[in-house]
């Protein structure tokens, strides 16, 4: 019997023998692909090859790809659905097509796996007669070949656009006794008799976002076989949780909860959810996903919180997901070593997120049960669902799932309306922007598709030839003064925006014209687009041109880029090796570095990181680059950007001998660290859970920043009439004095308001059988108003108190209702809401106490006079 690890290796070796290059799994975060939330299929990392915008080093490839699909999260817990899974695949980019794909697939399942041919059926796309003929050549009887429509046998695209095509699937037949028993039962029947093993996609088209399809440059092959499903079959198990993939993880869940697997259905469901989601969140975090309110971060948060919820149903009241993740890492790190490498970070992130949700879970569940009890008409309102989401962290899908268990639905339209009120959308656009499909179209229409030769590591000026000119309308022969365009050169000293470093600016000059380069972009096929505008004259295709970059700007960028590399080493020295780069931006003015860390840096940590960088600057260490095989670079421990894809040969940038920093980098740098001159951190902040950001300046900008700080300190010292070094102490004394005076004023206000409150008691009147006290108070703040209302409520015993004042030049209202009157239907929150609306504001609160304010203080008295009409 094959183990799952043996099956994985067996498959990859089989296709290596067929001339395929083994490719490592890419990250669950798709590289440079805005059409996908997460990696959903083995072909995702190869999309540029299928689109024809990049060329693979080997046109035959095979991989075992980590995949994640979000469509069935609520279904996880049954015997079949998973979020995270492994996809075995073999791929041809314009090399072989249907004949070889079908022959090798049949050979593998019948000869390598020894699955009896009589247990196998195949399905094909309706009109794919070619595939049918090829299956027959392999000996598959016509009676076990089934034609199906697009819903079953047309694959893709992975996202809203991309490669796609008809497909053919291999199915395993468990036997007539396992299904519906009908004589005409075939793989289109959902009775459970048949199990899809392998999907062979014949990639022929590129589909755009509108659904329009165009033929790809060369037909290709994309196959996918789920390792988990294959393991079930080869280990003769009922479901994936009984295979060696999940058995150790299920065992850990049983050990933690004291429950047994296989005893009752509800316990099994909870154990499966906890185990499957633990695996999913472990891989997501290891691949760089961070819990968030949107996007892939929301998927992670949703999984983690669903796991916690079902853990509670197993009696797991204390945090348990760190232990579960440990079991996942122990089981899978032999195949995916990044799990071991990032274990500390993964576990810390899980602990933090689980603790955050645990704080609100119990209260949220109590509120949800109350909502369920009070819900009439069978539907929980969107407003209630939003409150559970916004206040208690309940993903709406989780609320929907719990509601369904109670026979209720959720008003998702109302929930979305509430979300829209809160949601802010940031959009950015560029005149020249390229998504996957648009890039393919631009490259296809170029007259010159060869890679631009970058000479900018050595040169800042270069004689070149204009190979192409692109405008919004496509390629043109010439451009004139005022025209905006992108110029393609055969050789260029301009660095194209990549790896967080901004593109170079400068000029392209010909005998007849001058072109200002405002930015330089890098297309997937290696072509550089020099974007800008014609300043004077005319530029034409095939002209010789002098390309000049802005050298001073380049030097500023180089200072910041090299400093970024040293900073990453500094952070690992100060905070620990678990620090991972999560992004960077390098501009002439400053650098921005995002990294994984769960808490704010202390002042001491910031100072130590800064001192580390400046020490390396003072040492004037050599900065040098060399090319080497990617595998050698990893063996040497060179730092690679998390989630980035690299070719077989890479450029390694080192600082110092021996190196204090060694990273894969294609950017431009100083030649010695001393050229950076000075490094200064200007801010350290949070940009999300477990994600920190440092902004820093170097060189001239650092000097300017320090000068500004010194000027500010000098001005402050003058105002305090103290020496600069004495200013902090002087300021602290002044603040203490102000705080003391504030307390004195508050005490005086409190005494005055108490006296005023005593007088107010006599103004309480009987109105509709209740005691009502409505009054405007002067010279009190909101806190004092609250204390006054407490005093009046205690003295009245029973009644409604409405007080108003002007605080910070705005009207402020406070209402209290005693318990006996709440039972009669009076509600402080409703009263304050109406008062605040009169004054141009808003407010509300609980039945017993509420407060609110407005914008127009002139409306204060009018609002108070309207109280009786509200009762």
UniProtKB/Swiss-Prot annotation:
SUPFAM superfamilies: Class II aaRS and biotin synthetases (SSF55681), Putative anticodon-binding domain of alanyl-tRNA synthetase (AlaRS) (SSF101353), ThrRS/AlaRS common domain (SSF55186), Translation proteins (SSF50447). Gene3D superfamilies: 2.40.30.130, 3.10.310.40, 3.30.54.20, 6.10.250.550, Bira Bifunctional Protein, Domain 2, Threonyl-trna Synthetase, Chain A, domain 2. Transmembrane segments: none annotated. It is found in: Cytoplasm. It holds the Pfam family tRNA_SAD. CDD domains: AlaRS_core. Binds 1 zinc ion per subunit. Its main location: cytoplasm. SMART domains: tRNA_SAD. Consists of three domains; the N-terminal catalytic domain, the editing domain and the C-terminal C-Ala domain. The editing domain removes incorrectly charged amino acids, while the C-Ala domain, along with tRNA(Ala), serves as a bridge to cooperatively bring together the editing and aminoacylation centers thus stimulating deacylation of misacylated tRNAs. Belongs to the class-II aminoacyl-tRNA synthetase family. Catalyzes the attachment of alanine to tRNA(Ala) in a two-step reaction: alanine is first activated by ATP to form Ala-AMP and then transferred to the acceptor end of tRNA(Ala). Also edits incorrectly charged Ser-tRNA(Ala) and Gly-tRNA(Ala) via its editing domain. This is Alanine--tRNA ligase. It comes from Dehalococcoides mccartyi (strain ATCC BAA-2266 / KCTC 15142 / 195). The lineage of its organism: Bacteria, Bacillati, Chloroflexota, Dehalococcoidia, Dehalococcoidales.
């Amino acid at each position: 019997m094959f183990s799952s690890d043996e099956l994985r290796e067996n498959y990859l070796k089989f296709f290596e023998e067929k001339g395929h290059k083994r490719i490592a799994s890419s990250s669950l975060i798709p590289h440079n692909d805005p059409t996908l939330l997460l990696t959903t299929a083995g072909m995702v990392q190869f999309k540029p090859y299928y689109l024809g915008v990049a060329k693979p080093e080997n046109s035959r490839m095979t991989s075992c790809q980590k995949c994640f699909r979000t469509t069935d999260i609520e279904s996880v817990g049954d015997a079949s659905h998973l979020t995270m899974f492994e996809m075995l695949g073999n791929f041809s980019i314009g090399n072989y097509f249907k004949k070889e794909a079908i022959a090798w697939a049949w050979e593998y399942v019948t000869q390598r796996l020894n699955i009896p041919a009589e247990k196998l059926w195949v399905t094909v796309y309706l009109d794919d007669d070619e595939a049918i003929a090829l299956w027959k050549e392999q000996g598959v009887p016509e009676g076990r070949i089934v034609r199906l429509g697009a819903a079953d046998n047309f694959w893709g695209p992975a996202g809203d656009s991309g490669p796609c095509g008809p497909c053919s699937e291999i199915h395993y037949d468990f036997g007539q006794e396992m299904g519906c028993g009908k004589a005409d039962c075939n793989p289109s029947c959902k009775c459970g008799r048949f199990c899809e093993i392998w999907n062979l996609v014949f990639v022929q088209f590129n589909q755009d976002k509108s659904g329009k399809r165009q033929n790809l440059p060369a037909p290709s092959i994309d196959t996918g076989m789920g390792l988990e499903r294959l393991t079930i079959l080869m280990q003769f198990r009922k479901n994936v949780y009984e295979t060696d993939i999940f058995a150790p993880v299920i065992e850990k869940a049983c050990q933690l909860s004291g429950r047994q697997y296989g005893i009752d259905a509800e316990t099994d469901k909870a154990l499966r959810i906890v185990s499957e989601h633990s695996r999913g969140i472990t891989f997501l975090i290891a691949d760089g996903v961070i819990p968030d309110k949107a996007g892939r971060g929301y998927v992670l948060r949703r999984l983690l919180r669903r796991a916690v919820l079902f853990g509670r149903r197993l009696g797991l009241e204390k945090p348990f997901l760190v232990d579960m993740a440990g079991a996942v890492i122990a089981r899978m790190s032999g195949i995916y070593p990044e799990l071991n490498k990032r274990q500390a970070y993964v576990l810390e992130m899980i602990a933090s997120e689980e603790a955050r949700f645990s704080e609100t879970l119990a209260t949220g569940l109590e509120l949800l049960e109350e909502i369920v009890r009070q819900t009439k008409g069978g539907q929980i309102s969107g407003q209630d669902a939003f409150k559970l989401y916004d206040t208690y962290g309940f993903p709406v899908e989780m609320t929907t799932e719990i509601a369904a268990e109670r026979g209720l639905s959720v008003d998702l339209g109302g929930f979305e309306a509430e979300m829209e009120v809160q949601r802010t959308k940031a959009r950015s656009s560029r005149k020249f922007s390229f998504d996957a499909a648009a890039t393919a179209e631009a490259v296809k229409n170029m007259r010159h598709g060869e890679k631009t030769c970058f000479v900018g590591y050595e040169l800042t000026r270069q004689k070149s030839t204009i190979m192409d000119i692109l405008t919004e309308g496509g390629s043109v022969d010439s451009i004139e003064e005022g025209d905006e365009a992108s110029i393609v050169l055969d050789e260029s000293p301009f660095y194209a925006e990549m790896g967080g470093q901004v593109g170079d600016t400068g000029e392209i000059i010909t005998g007849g014209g001058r072109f200002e380069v405002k930015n330089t972009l890098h297309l997937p096929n290696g072509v550089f687009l020099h974007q800008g505008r014609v300043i004077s004259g005319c530029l034409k295709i095939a002209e010789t041109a002098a390309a000049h970059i802005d050298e001073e700007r380049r030097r500023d960028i180089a200072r910041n880029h090299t400093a970024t590399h040293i900073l990453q080493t500094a952070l690992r020295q100060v905070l620990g090796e678990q620090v991972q780069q999560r992004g960077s931006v390098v501009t002439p003015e400053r650098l921005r570095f995002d990294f994984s860390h769960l808490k704010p840096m202390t002042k001491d940590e910031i100072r130590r990181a800064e001192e580390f960088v400046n020490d390396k600057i003072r040492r004037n260490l050599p900065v040098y680059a060399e090319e080497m095989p990617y595998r050698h670079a990893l063996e040497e421990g060179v730092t690679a950007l998390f989630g980035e894809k690299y070719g077989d040969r890479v450029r390694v940038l080192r600082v110092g001998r021996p190196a204090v920093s060694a990273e894969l980098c294609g950017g431009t740098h100083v030649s010695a660290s001393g050229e950076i001159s000075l490094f200064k951190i200007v801010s350290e902040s949070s940009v999300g859970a477990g994600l920190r950001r440092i902004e820093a300046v170097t060189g001239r900008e650092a000097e300017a920043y320090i000068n500004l700080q010194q000027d500010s300190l000098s001005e402050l010292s003058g105002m305090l009439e103290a020496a600069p070094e004495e200013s902090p102490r002087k300021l602290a004394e002044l603040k203490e004095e102000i705080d003391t005076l504030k307390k004195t004023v508050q005490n005086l206000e409190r005494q005055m308001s108490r006296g005023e409150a005593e007088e107010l008691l006599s103004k309480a009147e009987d109105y509709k059988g209740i005691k009502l006290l409505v009054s405007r108070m002067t010279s009190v703040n909101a806190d004092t108003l609250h204390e006054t209302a407490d005093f009046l409520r205690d003295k009245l015993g029973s009644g409604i108190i409405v007080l108003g004042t002007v605080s910070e030049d705005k009207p402020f209202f406070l209402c209290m209702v005693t318990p006996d009157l709440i039972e009669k239907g009076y509600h402080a929150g409703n009263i304050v809401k109406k008062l605040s609306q009169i004054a141009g504001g808003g407010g509300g609160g609980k039945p017993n106490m509420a407060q609110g304010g407005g914008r127009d203080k002139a409306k204060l008295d009018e609002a108070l006079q309207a109280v009786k009409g509200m009762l």
